[in-house]
């Protein structure tokens, strides 16, 4: 009996330790969706439509951008010394084949997850890494946004390899800020999701699930 109790206690300890080394960003519930900050991109004709769904792996967010662009943001502190890795499970059902995503006229992505560090008094001074699910570029491609040098697009997934299927990816945000922005960031200030097609005037459909930070 004593050995069984010790085994149970040890299992609970390991479970708690595992949870302590993860920070979930979104629950993807109707209640959460109603509280998230929605920002329409300046000049866009319409907002991206976001809805909640559920599958065997839990809740997910569906994004439909039809000549539209708006993001969902959450101000949240992330300790990058403790949990430097972002984990994203996502899927693109309808992509944006043929556009030049690294130009102003084609700067649309079927799915994006931004990580944001405040570096000044206004949002325009913030530094961001824009992890994207590209329709045309290759994994690990990166380039500064054609609209602002303070945001860098980094390709984590591409529909050339994974189209209309769930895929989980991981990135070391702390190291990426060092490499891309030359900044040693100890704490993030926010995370945002966006699907946008306002430049290409096309339609994209994507899904997001299980976005969290981890220690490894």
Predicted segments with their positions:
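Extracellular carbohydrate-recognition regions
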Residues: 20-43
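Extracellular beta-strand ligand-recognition surfaces/modules
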Residues: 108-113, 149-151, 156-159, 163-203
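Extracellular/lumenal carbohydrate-interaction signature centered on repeated Trp-anchored short motifs
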Residues: 75-86, 160-163, 184
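Extracellular/luminal beta-rich ligand-recognition
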Residues: 106-151
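Extracellular beta-strand elements of beta-rich domains used
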Residues: 28, 191, 209-213
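Short carbohydrate-recognition loop motifs
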Residues: 49-71
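Bacterial N-terminal signal peptides
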Residues: 7-14
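Solvent-exposed strand-to-loop "edge" motifs in beta-rich extracellular domains
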Residues: 89-95, 118-120, 174
């Amino acid at each position: 009996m004593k050995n069984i109790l010790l085994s149970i206690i040890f299992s609970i300890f390991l479970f708690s330790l595992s949870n302590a080394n993860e920070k979930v960003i979104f629950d993807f519930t109707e209640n959460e969706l109603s509280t998230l900050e929605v920002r329409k991109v300046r000049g866009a004709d319409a907002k991206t439509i976001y809805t909640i769904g559920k599958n065997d792996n839990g809740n997910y967010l569906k994004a439909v951008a039809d000549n539209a662009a708006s993001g969902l943001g959450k101000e949240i502190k992330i300790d990058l010394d403790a949990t430097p890795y972002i984990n994203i499970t996502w899927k693109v059902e309808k992509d944006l084949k043929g556009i030049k995503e690294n130009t102003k006229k084609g700067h649309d992505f079927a799915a994006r997850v931004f990580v944001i560090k405040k570096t000044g008094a206004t949002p325009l001074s913030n530094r961001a890494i824009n992890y994207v699910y590209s329709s045309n570029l290759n994994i690990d491609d990166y380039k500064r946004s054609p609209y602002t040098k303070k945001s860098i697009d980094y390709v984590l997934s591409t529909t050339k390899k994974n189209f209309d299927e769930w895929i989980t990816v991981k990135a070391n945000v702390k190291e990426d800020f060092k490499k891309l922005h030359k900044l040693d960031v100890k704490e993030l200030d926010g995370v945002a999701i966006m699907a946008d097609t306002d430049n290409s005037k096309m339609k994209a459909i994507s899904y997001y699930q299980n976005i969290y930070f981890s220690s490894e």
